[in-house]
Amino acid sequence: MPFVNIYLPAGFTQQVKTRISLLVHESLMSVFKIPEKDYFQVIHPVMAEHLIYPDNYLNVPHTANLIYIQVTCGPGRTIEMKQALYALIAEKIAVSTPVSANDVIIVLTETGWENWSFGQGIAQMIK
């Protein structure tokens, strides 16, 4: 179960926010093979003055459309799967929204299953 936080400029329309959310989820389904209903995200609209970033980092230019995608998931994905996920998310967003691939920053954090509760105060993934 990935849990996704998406931080983006507050000025984005609801349509763009929803599209980005769906594109991230589609990418997770495609690469990580998660079920369709495994869809847990929070979208955080952020005022421009609160989005801090350099104009250029690692030879990648950034604009005011910069978004941060934070994915927290269970362990077990290979480096190749993670790289494929990053590429697919950036490509899908660049093709379908005003956000360029340069402006898609992704951070993925793996955490053990003992750190997850899907309700009822139970760590359901612990056998």
Describe each region flagged by the PLM.
Residues 1-127:
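Interaction-mediating elements
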